[in-house]
A protein has these predicted regions:
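Bacterial N-terminal signal peptides that target proteins for export
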Residues: 1-10
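Generic beta-strand/beta-sheet core signal
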Residues: 145, 180, 266, 288, ...
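Short, surface-exposed "cap/lid" segments of acyl-processing enzymes
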Residues: 566-570, 575-596
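Active-site-proximal cap/loop segments of hydrolase catalytic domains
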Residues: 91-94, 102, 587, 594-804
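Beta-propeller folds
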Residues: 23-540, 555, 590-591
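Secondary-structure transition/capping motifs at alpha-helix termini
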Residues: 150, 288-293, 356-357, 389-392, ...
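N-terminal cap/lid segment of alpha/beta-hydrolase-fold proteins
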Residues: 527-570
Length: 804
């Protein structure tokens, strides 16, 4: 269908019409126990207000139907658009919204318009106001509510435009909204199926390597449709006032200044690109005042062509406001041309300039490596600057005192990004009274919440750190045998430890929220929710953390699941599920991730359901690829084979697995791993590969962590491409892929071509292409079918095998 035809269709049929019923005869159901668990309603999601006194409670169904997933979409400039809604295409909405007090004793159902569904909800930083969006026949509506009258939300607009951003954000005061109203679509001319001309691209000799993107613009009609759908009018709504228009443009999210009188605005401009997503299109960045008048044209950001892979644009980027200052703009600039391959003593600098932008900007600080953002103290005088060393995969965080520019910054964090054990935890932040993100502070103390990775699994913690001495005090740590993580700190009371919200779970108890008081006896625990186990019939499944070593001594780990009725001495068929990750050194590669004490949620297309069919499952088996970041993939195949062999040996040595009945599977890069293991080893009797990429010559400018191009590392690209070794895949391989996969690199064609290669070489394979599905699978019909196909495949080629 031509774009002109589609625009006519939008104008004539902009109602939310139901998608035509699809023939379901081809979709299958898995065993009843699996189907029942998939259909079990999930617990509601909880969003606490910033002061933690109240919460929004959102209810949804387990899975959407295929008709909802397959609603028509426009695939333009790297974004999928539900045109009648003037919003991003999504596969599931929510059905109920409630306001509850902290303890859940008082709950008020917030009314939704008849026939409409809840898209999302959020709190203002003042904790008194909340907003939510609904979708219906006329489009997307924005509503504003107050905690004192939750049953009487106010309709702000029934024509929200939420394509490039959420479509609304809070004013500095927190009691009003910035929002974007969809501009009327232009009148469509008569549909013309004859192209106006050829599609041309040209290059002029400059280096411009690009990752592979999907859903890009393809022609002038695409560009016109994208522009028409994204164009909107930006408004500011304050209490007691009429909405004030800031004009029509291709608006991004506005960023109001602390003074409430100025706002930073971003808009997309032409020329568009046919090779990059909209985030690389030219941008206009400007500051306007409370009367919508232009104060300063901050930047005209050019089309992002020629930006090196893993690099950044030259010129100003990452604009934002400095907290505790009325209207001081802060931004970053590259000093190395934005190229991570260029040698440089200093890569970035941060600058600031106050409205009305008189004089020259002030340089705040420089970073030796690529800047990763700023985290401010509440007074705006000290700032934590993050930076990242791409070559070493190393992260640092330095505390700068801007009142003492000559003082050396103090190091708060300095570690490999893969060093889970050395992670000091994330600095906890909150929104101040003007809506700016700042560190949570008690005098000189700031707070950190972390995962607490250890050899025994994760034990989350809460620390506080003195910014004067940099000493850290452990305030709380999760008890052994469970998993409890910090959600948020309550507003602090001077002279006492803070209370904090946590999310508690254990192998037998589903996640629930708690309030912990560190000043009270025995931790002062108060239960805030009481969500029940959605699948109690599966709770008998056994689960344990298993540690072992690769042949070269690298420590590895996995979580082993066994059926509830398993008896010691009984050997089961084994299913190994993994995802390779890259490491610079063995010490971090061997660190344990995750926790064996988390609640196991059986849902969706999860491979954990195989345990209900009599399988042992080794989940999240570590598959480290270790070496120099530039060359580690030269030994990718050897390393994953070694890790897989170690996992199988361990399960067999434990007496739970039968070496003659072992299968392997993975998703995305894990699917790539699966195909390689079948092509280059005889460890497995079958495999399941979902949504993978198998021919790396089709991702020639890098993939995953590979930094070299196909022409720089031809042998490696060929060596790790299972498509080019399809003649070696002599074990049965089930290939599953969403027909609408938009993940970079994993085009659906990748699975289609691998299937053809296996078939042509006399191998055994089955290709399942899922209509309407993207990189993950959402529709109930699709999920059920994937489970049925997977269970049957394993039983047919592995589970039913005779044991030698």
């Amino acid at each position: 269908m031509t774009r002109d035809h589609r625009l006519v269709g939008l104008l004539l049929g902009s109602l939310l019409l139901p998608f035509p019923a699809l023939a379901q005869g081809g979709y299958r159901l898995p065993p009843q126990a699996v189907a029942d668990a998939i259909d079990a309603p999930p617990p509601p999601s909880i969003a606490f207000a910033p002061d933690a006194a109240r919460a929004l409670e959102v209810h949804r169904d387990s899975l959407p139907g295929l008709a909802e997933v397959m609603r028509p979409m426009e695939r333009l400039a790297g974004v999928r658009i539900d045109a009648p809604l003037r919003a991003r295409h999504r596969t599931q909405y929510n059905r109920e919204l409630w306001l509850r007090d902290q303890l859940g004793r008082e709950r008020t159902r917030i009314p939704l318009p008849e026939g409409e569904q809840l898209a999302g909800a959020s709190w203002s930083h003042d904790s008194a106001h909340f907003a939510f969006t609904t979708v219906g026949e006329g489009g997307t509506s924005l509503w504003l509510g107050h905690v004192n009258a939750p049953g009487e939300p106010r309709l702000v607009t029934d024509s929200l435009c939420a394509i490039l951003w959420s479509g609304y954000t809070w004013t500095s005061a927190g009691d009003g909204l910035w929002y974007s109203v969809a501009a009327p679509l232009p009148e469509a001319g008569a549909a013309n199926p004859i192209p106006a001309g050829p599609i041309t691209s040209e290059c002029g000799g400059e280096l411009s390597p690009l990752r592979t993107y999907q859903d890009l613009l393809e022609c002038a009609e695409d560009a016109a449709l994208f522009e028409a759908l994204v164009r909107s009018e930006l408004f500011r709504l304050d209490p007691g006032s009429e909405p004030l228009s800031y004009g029509v443009a291709l608006w991004g999210a506005p960023d109001p200044a602390p003074d409430g009188e100025h706002v930073l605005l971003r808009s997309i401009e032409r020329p568009f690109s046919y090779m990059m997503p909209w985030s690389r299109f030219p941008q206009r960045i400007e500051v306007r005042d409370s009367n919508a008048q232009l104060v300063q044209a901050v930047a005209e950001v050019p089309l992002g062509e020629g930006v090196p892979i893993d690099g950044v644009r030259t010129g100003a980027r990452n604009h934002g406001w400095r907290p505790a200052h009325p209207a001081t703009l802060v931004w970053c600039e590259a000093l190395d041309g934005g190229d991570p391959k260029r040698d440089a003593q200093v890569r970035d600098r941060w600058l600031a300039q106050a409205v009305p932008f008189a004089g020259e900007p002030i340089e705040l600080l420089r970073t030796a490596e690529r800047a990763r953002g700023l985290t401010w103290t509440a007074d705006g005088q000290r700032v934590v600057a993050g930076e990242y060393d791409r070559d070493r995969r190393w992260t640092r965080a330095l505390l700068h005192d801007l009142a003492q520019p000559d003082a050396e910054p103090r190091v708060l964090e300095d570690r490999s990004i893969r060093d889970r054990y050395g992670d000091p935890g994330a600095l906890m932040t909150e929104r101040d009274a003007q809506g700016q993100s700042v560190l949570i502070q008690d005098g000189a103390f700031v707070y950190r919440a972390g995962e607490g990775a250890s050899d025994d699994g994760a034990r989350p913690f809460l620390d506080r750190q003195d910014l004067e001495s940099l000493r850290t005090q452990r305030m709380w740590r999760c008890s052994p045998g469970s998993y409890e993580s910090v959600v948020a700190l309550e507003r602090r009371t001077p002279g006492r430890f803070p209370r904090f919200l946590s999310r508690y779970e254990s192998p037998a108890e589903p996640p629930n929220y708690r309030l912990r008081d560190l000043d009270a006896q025995a931790g002062g625990i108060v239960a805030l929710t009481n969500f029940l186990d959605p699948t109690p019939e599966l709770r008998g499944v056994r689960k344990q953390l298993v540690t072992y070593e690769r042949a070269d001594g690298v420590p590895l780990s996995a979580t082993l699941y066994l059926p509830a009725d398993w008896q010691p001495g009984t050997r089961l068929p084994l299913f190994l599920w993994a995802y390779p990750r890259e490491y610079n050194d063995p010490s971090t590669a061997g660190q344990v991730s995750g926790s064996p004490y988390r609640f196991t949620r059986f849902s969706g297309s999860s491979h954990l359901f195989f345990v209900t069919q009599g399988w042992a499952v080794m989940d999240n088996a570590t598959m480290p690829v270790i070496g120099d970041p530039q060359t580690m993939n030269d030994t990718f195949v050897e390393q994953i084979v070694m890790a897989a062999e170690a996992a199988i040996d361990t399960a067999c040595d434990m007496g739970v697995a039968d070496r003659g009945r072992v299968a392997v599977g993975g998703h995305s890069y894990g699917a790539f791993m699966t195909a390689n293991l079948l092509a280059h080893s005889d460890l497995f009797q079958a495999g399941i590969a979902r949504s993978g990429a198998y021919n790396r010559t089709l991702t020639p400018f890098g993939f995953q962590a590979e930094r070299r191009t196909l022409w720089e590392a031809t042998d490696t690209y060929i060596g790790v491409s299972p498509f080019l070794h399809a003649d070696g895949i002599d074990e049965p391989l089930l290939l599953v892929h969403g027909q609408m996969d938009n993940n970079s690199g994993t085009f659906p064609m990748q699975s289609e071509r691998l299937f053809q290669a296996i078939k042509g070489n006399g191998g055994t394979s089955r290709l399942v292409m899922l209509p309407g599905e993207s990189h993950g699978y959402r529709a109930r019909e699709s999920v059920m079918h994937v489970q049925a196909e997977s269970i049957d495949w394993l039983q047919r080629y592995v589970g039913a095998r005779s044991v030698d």
